[in-house]
Amino acid sequence: MTAITAFFFLTLPWLNPFSPGPTAAVVPLLFSWVCAALAVLVVVAARAQTTSQTLVRTLALAWLAGASVSALIGLLQYFGGTAWAGPWLNHTSIGEAYGNLRQRNQFATLMNIGLVALLWWTASPPEVYLNKNWPSLPPRMRFFVCVMLAMLISAGNAASSSRTGLVQLGLLSVLTWIWLRPSAGSKGHAWHLRPVAQILLIALLAYAVATAALPLLAGLDPAASGAWARLKSGDTVCSSRLTLWGNVLHLISQKPWLGWGWGELDYAHFVTLYSGERFCDILDNAHNLPLHLAVEFGLPVATLACGTGTWLLWRARPWREPDSTRQMAWGILAMIGLHSLLEYPLWYGPFQIAALAAIWLLQAKKTEKTQPFNAAVLYTKGLVAIFIIALCLVLAWHYQLASQIYLSPENRMAAYQADTQKKIQGIPFFQDQVRFAELTTADLTTENAKAIHALALDMLHFSPEPRVIELILDSARLLGKIDEADFYARRYQAAFPEAYGRWLVTKSGLVNPTSQPGGSISNH
């Protein structure tokens, strides 16, 4: 029962459909950490009855189940079949799929994490997967189930149209080929068994077939759909990663030693005028972990972090790893690591938990005998888990309070339907969201121009979007700060030329901001 309960908590973060504003990532992040802490508490409560192998099995099954169920959701989304589920499934246009993770590359990474776990199950001998808590199947039936799951997960990956997912599949194929070689060793049930190669080959074939078949079945053009089509067509220049990385490298050159500061990339991108092409959106992440560390913390910190990681990787030599459980852990980290070179999965709860779990697997003992827990370590883990749950609940409550101003009055909690802004003014957390709402619901006048101007300048570091910039421009002109208004106007024109043009056309004298904040905050 312990393993089943822990499995439930470890699977849920991948399937959570809810991400209420104003900052969509907050609730999934808190939910993921609460689930992980509850899983730890379940294991702690079981005391010495839980073996390391049981925990490994539970993690692998949770990754596999999360990927399989998400693949089903993704296929429903791809064919427009999610309306019946209401709020319990995210809804997309036909031809799109991202499960309940709300982003195609995150969905594709989950598919490949699930495939890594499936290969581990395929390679594991009966003494690893047979357990009174898990159903057992005859070998042929078990292989058949693995084949079906490989096809399902690969179809989900293909439905995502994620180029990242395609590259990850190639990386996993290379890693598996390395680990299948006799020189990789044979200890610990390594992935040298022929069924592993068969399952991986089936997964690759299923991906290729699904890439061609899914668009046809959905009434779409196969030449314009899928990861291969997106690889061939590429992105527009202003939205490509090459443009983005070029801008980030320029920003690094401006402040190479200490960087721009944590969370300041979006501000840095807005206030900088580039000589070449400009990335045409708010830029709050470098979409490459080493570059992000460099632009926000400086080159010395980035070099130290990346150098340490490279040294640890070289010492561990994962390409020589003979143990299948550690191979699975390295596979999970490889999928997340590759994704981190193109985006920022480690900013999201499910991937944080997966990365930490994979690191734990690398440290776990290879023995399958029951090991009694050290009492001090056991209770320390329990106390840490309780602290995490308590902290997340406190943060969730304050986030709920901060979000009230973003709702229409009738949808707010009863105690916050009137004087909402005043009542949430003093909450200790999520003050950026509260102050952003204060700014965007205020009417600019000569009396409050100074306060609005100061607040807008501050909020520019939180969300440099058109309505914030326009308040800076209007309040600056009211205060007679013409040079400052011109400074930000040039940057507004460079960053958001269409919005700037509309602002020029519509403004006559002062332009008041909207009376209600939006339901979400751009890129936050």
What does each of the following model-derived ranges do?
Residues 103, 242-283, 290, 297-303:
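TM-adjacent membrane-interface loops and short helices in multi-pass inner/ER membrane proteins
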Residues 92-108, 233-242, 283-296:
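Short aromatic-rich membrane-water interface segments that cap or initiate transmembrane helices
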Residues 53-60, 137-144, 185-202, 369-389:
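Membrane-interfacial entry segments at the cytosolic side of transmembrane helices
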Residues 215-220, 379-419:
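Hydrophobic alpha-helical transmembrane segments in integral membrane proteins
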Residues 157-160, 165, 177-236, 244, ...:
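A membrane-periplasm/extracellular boundary helix in multi-pass inner-membrane enzymes
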Residues 418-524:
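C-terminal luminal/periplasmic domains and tails of membrane-associated envelope-modifying transferases
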Residues 2-22, 30-44, 58-94, 99-185, ...:
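Alpha-helical transmembrane segments of multi-pass inner-membrane proteins
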Residues 117, 168-176, 321-378:
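Transmembrane alpha-helices of multi-pass inner-membrane enzymes
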